[in-house]
From Swiss-Prot:
Pfam families: PRA-CH, PRA-PH. It catalyses: 1-(5-phospho-beta-D-ribosyl)-ATP + H2O = 1-(5-phospho-beta-D-ribosyl)-5'-AMP + diphosphate + H(+); 1-(5-phospho-beta-D-ribosyl)-5'-AMP + H2O = 1-(5-phospho-beta-D-ribosyl)-5-[(5-phospho-beta-D-ribosylamino)methylideneamino]imidazole-4-carboxamide. It comes from Wolinella succinogenes (strain ATCC 29543 / DSM 1740 / CCUG 13145 / JCM 31913 / LMG 7466 / NCTC 11488 / FDC 602W). This is Histidine biosynthesis bifunctional protein HisIE. Residues 128-229 are annotated as: Phosphoribosyl-ATP pyrophosphohydrolase. It is found in: Cytoplasm. Pathway: Amino-acid biosynthesis; L-histidine biosynthesis; L-histidine from 5-phospho-alpha-D-ribose 1-diphosphate: step 2/9; Amino-acid biosynthesis; L-histidine biosynthesis; L-histidine from 5-phospho-alpha-D-ribose 1-diphosphate: step 3/9. InterPro entries: His_synth_HisIE, HisE, PRA-CH, PRib-ATP_PPHydrolase-like, PRib_AMP_CycHydrolase_dom, PRib_AMP_CycHydrolase_sf. One of its GO terms (cellular component) is cytoplasm. Gene3D superfamilies: MazG-like, Phosphoribosyl-AMP cyclohydrolase. Its main location: cytoplasm.
Length: 229
C-alpha cells in the first residue's frame, strides 16, 4: 500500500468523501464515499470503486451502465480525510444522464436553475442494477407485504411459471399490439426474469458478460459449442 495512504485513520474515518474530477477539463463530476476496501479495489483495478451508504455494499462505478471511471491520479487533502480522484470518465457520471452530478446552479439571488445539458438516457440502464438489489431486499420478507415477497415465498416453480406466462404475453403483444403495450409486456417479462435471477443469487452482470462473450460469434457456432461441452 502507498505509504501516504497508510496515514489514513480508518477507525476515526471509516468512510471518506471522494471528490471525482475529470482529467484534463478539471470539471467536478460527482461526490461519493470510500471505505478502505473500496480504496484498495480502486488502486488494484485502476477503476473507481465506492461504498454505497444506501445499499451497504461496495460498488464499481458503471457496473451496470458501463460508465466506468478510469483512475489517473489520486490525491489526499492536508488532513488525510478527503480523497480527490482524477479520472477519465467513460460516458456520463450522473445517474440522471448528465455528464456531472453538479448541474443545478444556485444563482447569487438564491434562485435555482438547471443547466441546459440534455441527459444521456443510456445512463438509465443502471435501473436494472437498482431493481435487482431491491428484489434481493424482498427475499425473506413477509409474503403479505408485497407481490415480489409472495413470489419468493412460493419458490422456483411459481416464479418459473410466471416467467413463461409473461413471455407468452410479450409474444402475443409483438404480434398484435401497439408499441406501448409491447414495452409494457417486455418490462413485465424482464421484471419476472430478474426475480428468478435474484431467487438463484445470479447478478444481471453475468448475463451482460455472456451477451458480450457472444458478440461476433454466430448463433449457430455458439449453439454448437454448447453441444460440444
Amino acid at each position: 500500500m502507498n505509504t501516504l495512504l497508510d496515514g489514513i485513520d480508518w477507525e476515526k474515518h471509516p468512510l471518506l468523501p471522494a471528490i471525482v474530477q475529470e482529467r484534463g477539463s478539471g470539471e467536478v463530476l460527482m461526490l461519493a464515499y470510500m471505505n478502505q476496501e473500496a480504496l484498495n479495489l480502486t488502486l488494484s483495478t485502476q477503476v473507481a470503486h465506492y461504498f454505497s451508504r444506501s445499499k451497504g455494499r461496495i460498488w464499481k462505478k458503471g457496473e451496470s451502465s458501463g460508465h466506468i471511471q478510469k483512475i489517473h491520479e489520486i490525491f489526499l487533502d492536508c488532513d488525510s480525510d478527503t480523497i480527490l480522484l482524477q479520472v477519465e470518465q467513460v460516458g456520463v457520471a450522473c445517474h440522471t444522464g448528465r455528464k456531472s452530478c453538479f448541474f443545478q446552479k444556485v444563482e447569487l439571488d438564491s434562485s435555482l436553475s438547471l443547466t441546459s445539458e440534455a441527459p444521456d438516457t443510456s445512463a438509465l440502464y443502471g435501473v436494472v442494477d437498482r431493481l435487482y438489489h431491491e428484489l434481493l431486499a424482498r427475499q425473506g420478507a413477509d409474503p403479505q407485504s408485497s407481490y415480489t415477497a409472495k413470489l419468493f415465498s412460493k419458490g422456483e416453480n411459481t416464479i418459473g411459471k410466471k416467467i413463461v406466462e409473461e413471455a407468452a404475453e410479450l409474444s402475443f403483444a409483438i404480434k398484435d399490439s401497439s408499441e406501448s403495450e409491447i414495452v409494457y409486456e417486455a418490462a413485465d417479462l424482464l421484471y419476472h426474469a430478474l426475480v428468478g435471477l435474484a431467487f438463484r443469487g445470479i447478478h444481471p452482470d453475468k448475463i451482460k458478460q455472456e451477451l458480450q462473450r457472444r458478440q461476433g460469434v454466430s448463433g449457430i457456432a455458439e449453439k454448437n459449442s454448447r453441444k460440444d461441452s
